[in-house]
């Protein structure tokens, strides 16, 4: 087996935690990987941080002339993956998360014939800006199908982030790269779902040990906590796109999703975001969301119920005042 079967790819922009991320890569007990860093025209002097790891990590550093992640994050992911040299497996990581020292070793412990036909997953811890573990989410089952992944994810039984999956290049090429939504909101979820659908073995989680987990950082620099009007509006539009994508996938692969194909609740999740942020939007905007949902997803009942609930709550709120 070649020494560079695994490409670890970091689309980099922020410098705050990059050194800690690279330290975690440098500490890998199994060196059968090559690291690719795609500097998204960052103003934060990333090259100076990266220089300190020359000779410690087998890597390629490339600084792009233009910033792309600010307008199309998925396109930035993909141009960084394009830096790779044909490695059969790709691990898209980040510039602020941390991998356990035995992650690469445990990846190679999965038999090659299994790896070729599965998306490989690591369990995670959630850490804060001080790198303290603040939460340990539920572990994944050892193996789950695309249908089980969808069921567990949308029922809140599991969570997932982009950095906890290693995927075969062959499947990545087959599906045409990442599913692209504005802000990359749900892009990783939809992509893992599609990859699991295309994989004979679905999603397989490596043996859960403390040294083979990924620490995902809940940082003030992430998009997730941003509750501004503009960001929330874009998130909701992307969530409606996510729901439409799931509906299309269920129709395209009915045998893969036989147990959930008729469960309408699997595509009503955009309304949770609308309800949580209803005070940010006018009734006209909420109506536009529901119309968009009806047009692209269907299931008029969900849209009507959501709109009526918000209309009544706003009416009651006005009269309470």
Language-model segments: which ranges?
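Catalytic core of nucleotide-sugar-dependent glycosyltransferases
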Residues: 189, 211-220, 225-257, 281-294
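Short, well-formed alpha-helical segments that are part of the catalytic scaffolds
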Residues: 14-27
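Glycine-rich, basic loop-to-helix element that forms the pyrophosphate-binding segment
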Residues: 65-85
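Membrane-interface aromatic/basic loop that binds lipid-linked glycans or pyrophosphate carriers
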Residues: 1, 264-321
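Short beta-strand-to-loop acidic/aromatic patch adjacent to the donor-nucleotide binding site
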Residues: 87-98
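Conserved nucleotide-sugar donor-binding catalytic segment
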Residues: 8, 145-230
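Acidic donor-binding segment of Leloir-type glycosyltransferases
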Residues: 26-65
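Conserved donor NDP-sugar-binding/catalytic core segment of glycosyltransferases
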Residues: 102-135
């Amino acid at each position: 087996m070649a020494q560079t079967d695994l490409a670890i790819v970091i689309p980099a922009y922020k410098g705050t935690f990059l050194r800690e991320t690279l330290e975690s890569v440098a500490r890998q007990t199994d060196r059968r990987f090559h690291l690719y860093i795609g500097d998204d025209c960052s103003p934060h002097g990333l090259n100076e941080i990266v220089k300190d790891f020359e000779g410690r990590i087998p890597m390629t550093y490339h600084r792009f002339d233009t910033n792309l992640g600010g307008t199309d994050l998925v396109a930035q992911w993909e141009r960084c993956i394009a830096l790779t040299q044909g490695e059969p497996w790709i691990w898209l990581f980040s510039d602020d998360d941390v991998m356990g020292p035995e992650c690469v070793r445990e990846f190679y412990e999965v038999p090659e014939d299994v790896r070729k036909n599965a998306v490989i997953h690591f369990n995670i811890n959630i850490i804060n800006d001080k790198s303290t573990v603040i939460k340990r989410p539920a572990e994944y089952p050892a193996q789950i199908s695309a249908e089980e992944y969808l069921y567990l994810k949308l029922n809140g039984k599991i969570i997932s982030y982009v950095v906890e999956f290693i995927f075969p290049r062959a499947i990545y090429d087959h599906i045409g790269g990442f599913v692209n939504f504005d802000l990359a909101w749900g892009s990783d979820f939809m992509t893992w779902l599609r990859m699991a659908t295309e994989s004979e073995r679905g999603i397989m989680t490596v043996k859960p040990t403390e040294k083979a987990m990924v620490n995902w950082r809940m940082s003030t620099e992430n998009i997730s906590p941003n509750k501004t009007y503009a960001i929330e509006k874009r998130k909701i539009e992307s969530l409606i796109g996510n729901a439409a994508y799931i509906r299309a996938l269920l129709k395209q692969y009915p045998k893969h999703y036989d147990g959930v194909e008729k469960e309408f609740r699997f595509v009503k999740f955009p309304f949770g975001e609308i309800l949580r942020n209803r005070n940010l939007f006018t009734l006209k905007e909420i109506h536009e969301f529901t119309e968009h949902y009806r047009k692209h997803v269907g299931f008029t009942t969900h849209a009507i119920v959501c709109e009526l609930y918000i209309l009544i709550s706003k009416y009651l709120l006005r009269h309470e005042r």
